[in-house]
Protein backbone atom coordinates (compact mmCIF):
# COMPACT_ATOMS: atom_id res chain seq x y z
CA UNK A 1 0.00 0.00 0.00
CA UNK A 2 2.91 2.35 0.73
CA UNK A 3 4.20 1.90 -2.81
CA UNK A 4 0.84 2.72 -4.35
CA UNK A 5 0.49 5.88 -2.23
CA UNK A 6 4.01 6.94 -3.18
CA UNK A 7 3.29 6.35 -6.87
CA UNK A 8 0.11 8.43 -6.72
CA UNK A 9 1.98 11.30 -5.04
CA UNK A 10 4.76 11.18 -7.64
CA UNK A 11 2.25 11.27 -10.47
CA UNK A 12 0.39 14.23 -8.98
CA UNK A 13 3.44 16.36 -8.22
CA UNK A 14 5.10 18.45 -10.91
CA UNK A 15 4.13 18.83 -14.53
CA UNK A 16 1.85 16.29 -16.04
CA UNK A 17 3.08 16.97 -19.56
CA UNK A 18 6.14 15.36 -21.14
CA UNK A 19 8.12 18.62 -20.92
CA UNK A 20 7.51 21.81 -18.99
CA UNK A 21 9.52 24.84 -17.96
CA UNK A 22 7.72 27.73 -16.29
CA UNK A 23 4.52 28.45 -18.23
CA UNK A 24 5.71 26.43 -21.25
CA UNK A 25 4.47 22.87 -21.67
CA UNK A 26 4.20 20.19 -24.29
CA UNK A 27 0.58 19.14 -24.70
CA UNK A 28 -1.52 17.04 -27.09
CA UNK A 29 -4.80 17.98 -28.76
CA UNK A 30 -6.41 15.60 -31.25
CA UNK A 31 -3.16 13.69 -31.63
CA UNK A 32 -1.09 16.80 -32.40
CA UNK A 33 1.85 17.44 -30.07
CA UNK A 34 2.57 21.13 -29.44
CA UNK A 35 4.74 23.36 -27.30
CA UNK A 36 2.58 26.06 -25.79
CA UNK A 37 2.15 28.71 -23.15
CA UNK A 38 -0.06 27.49 -20.30
CA UNK A 39 -2.48 30.24 -19.27
CA UNK A 40 -4.18 28.04 -16.68
CA UNK A 41 -7.22 25.79 -16.35
CA UNK A 42 -5.94 23.49 -19.10
CA UNK A 43 -5.79 26.30 -21.66
CA UNK A 44 -2.70 26.66 -23.85
CA UNK A 45 -1.61 29.15 -26.46
CA UNK A 46 0.32 27.24 -29.10
CA UNK A 47 3.86 28.21 -29.96
CA UNK A 48 5.42 25.41 -32.07
CA UNK A 49 3.81 22.19 -33.35
CA UNK A 50 5.45 18.76 -33.29
CA UNK A 51 8.50 19.52 -31.12
CA UNK A 52 11.07 16.71 -31.09
CA UNK A 53 13.77 18.23 -28.87
CA UNK A 54 13.47 21.17 -26.45
CA UNK A 55 16.06 22.83 -24.22
CA UNK A 56 15.64 26.03 -22.22
CA UNK A 57 17.59 28.59 -20.27
CA UNK A 58 16.40 31.75 -18.53
CA UNK A 59 16.20 33.80 -21.75
CA UNK A 60 15.46 31.35 -24.56
CA UNK A 61 13.90 28.04 -25.53
CA UNK A 62 15.55 26.13 -28.38
CA UNK A 63 13.32 23.73 -30.30
CA UNK A 64 13.89 21.17 -33.02
CA UNK A 65 10.44 20.54 -34.49
CA UNK A 66 8.78 18.91 -37.48
CA UNK A 67 5.51 20.74 -38.13
CA UNK A 68 3.81 19.59 -41.33
CA UNK A 69 6.52 16.91 -41.77
CA UNK A 70 9.26 19.52 -42.38
CA UNK A 71 11.91 19.53 -39.66
CA UNK A 72 13.76 22.70 -38.69
CA UNK A 73 15.18 24.65 -35.75
CA UNK A 74 13.36 27.40 -33.84
CA UNK A 75 13.85 29.50 -30.75
CA UNK A 76 11.54 31.42 -28.44
CA UNK A 77 12.60 34.66 -26.77
CA UNK A 78 11.14 34.15 -23.30
CA UNK A 79 11.67 37.78 -22.31
CA UNK A 80 9.39 39.02 -25.10
CA UNK A 81 6.77 36.27 -24.77
CA UNK A 82 3.59 36.64 -22.76
CA UNK A 83 0.09 35.28 -23.09
CA UNK A 84 -1.17 38.30 -25.04
CA UNK A 85 1.73 38.51 -27.54
CA UNK A 86 1.51 37.38 -31.14
CA UNK A 87 3.83 34.47 -31.97
CA UNK A 88 5.67 36.48 -34.65
CA UNK A 89 7.00 38.74 -31.90
CA UNK A 90 9.05 36.06 -30.13
CA UNK A 91 9.07 32.73 -32.06
CA UNK A 92 11.91 32.72 -34.57
CA UNK A 93 12.52 30.17 -37.32
CA UNK A 94 12.55 27.93 -39.19
CA UNK A 95 16.34 27.72 -39.43
CA UNK A 96 18.70 25.19 -40.95
CA UNK A 97 21.07 23.41 -38.59
CA UNK A 98 24.00 25.54 -39.77
CA UNK A 99 22.12 28.82 -39.27
CA UNK A 100 20.88 27.71 -35.87
CA UNK A 101 24.38 26.78 -34.67
CA UNK A 102 25.53 30.30 -35.56
CA UNK A 103 22.58 31.79 -33.66
CA UNK A 104 23.37 29.56 -30.67
CA UNK A 105 26.83 31.07 -30.46
CA UNK A 106 25.67 34.65 -31.03
CA UNK A 107 22.65 34.68 -28.69
CA UNK A 108 23.80 31.98 -26.25
CA UNK A 109 20.80 29.79 -27.04
CA UNK A 110 20.41 26.45 -25.26
CA UNK A 111 22.14 23.69 -27.23
CA UNK A 112 19.94 21.14 -28.94
CA UNK A 113 20.54 17.49 -29.60
CA UNK A 114 18.31 15.93 -32.23
Question: Can you name each region flagged by the protein language model?
Answer:
Residues 4-7, 53, 67-68:
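A generic structural signal for short, solvent-exposed coil/turn residues
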Residues 68-77:
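Structural motif
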Residues 82-114:
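C-terminal partner/receptor-binding element of secreted or periplasmic proteins
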Amino acid sequence: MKHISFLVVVLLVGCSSSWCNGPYEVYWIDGVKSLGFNVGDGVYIGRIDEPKSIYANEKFISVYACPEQTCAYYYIDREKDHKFAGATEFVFGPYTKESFVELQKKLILPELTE
